[in-house]
Amino acid sequence: MAKELPEHFARHGANLILLDISPEIEKLADELCGRGHRCTAVVADVRDPASVAAAIKRAKEKEGRIDILVNNAGVCRLGSFLDMSDEDRDFHIDINIKGVWNVTKAVLPEMIARKDGRIVMMSSVTGDMVADPGETAYALTKAAIVGLTKSLAVEYAQSGIRVNAICPGYVRTPMAESIARQSNPEDPESVLTEMAKAIPMRRLADPLEVGELAAFLASDESSYLTGTQNVIDGGSTLPETVSVGI
C-alpha cells in the first residue's frame, strides 16, 4: 500500500511527505507532484534512528510541520518457527516494530508541543486476532503494534494526540503477492484465489479501501476515536471454522 495510501491522502488534499528506504520513492513523489499534489520524498532507513531523525528534519524544513503520521512500513517472510533464523526474526522486529517506534519517536514531540496530532498504525488481523502457519515472526510484530497503539493513545491523549490502528486482512498488495509466491512459486495466483475463497466477501481488499479508513482515522471526523483496532477484513475473522455447509 506504499503507493495507494499516499495517492488517497493526496486526493483528500493532504500535503505529503513520503519516507522509504528505496530511492524509488522519489519517482512516486514526482508522479504525484505532476498531478498537482504537493509531495516531498525523503530516503531513510526506519531501522536507524539517526537516519529517520535526519529525514524528518529535512522534511520539516521544506513542509513546516507534520500533522499526521501513517506508519505503513512492514515486511513478512514465511517460515516455520523452528526453521526461521535469528536473522529473519530480527528482520521482522527491526522493521515492523523498531521502525514504527523510531519514526513515531521522531515525529511525536512536535505534535505534543502543538497539542495536536494523529497517528495511524498499520497492524493486521494476524497476530492479535488470528494466526497462520509460517507467520510467527510477522504475527509477533503486528500484535506488538496493537499494544503500542493502545499505550501511546493512553499516554498522550491529554496532549491532543490520537493514535489508532488499522488491522487489515488480506489486501491485494505486493506483500500479499509475495506471500503467495513464497507459498506456491509455480502458481501464486492460485494462492490468492484460495485466500479469497476463505473470506465471506469472497475477495481480497482493495488498497484504496484501506486508504479510505486511514484517511478517516486521520481526519476530524474521527475526533473521539483513540486507541482503537479497526478491522477491515471482509469478514474473514468472523467464521468459527471453515464452512462445510452451504
Regions found by a protein language model. Name each.
Residues 1-17:
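Canonical Rossmann dinucleotide-binding motif of NAD(H)/NADP(H)-dependent dehydrogenases/reductases
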Residues 80-81, 88-93, 195:
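Substrate-binding pocket helix/loop in short-chain dehydrogenase/reductase
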Residues 124:
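Residue(s) in the substrate-gating loop at a strand-loop-helix junction
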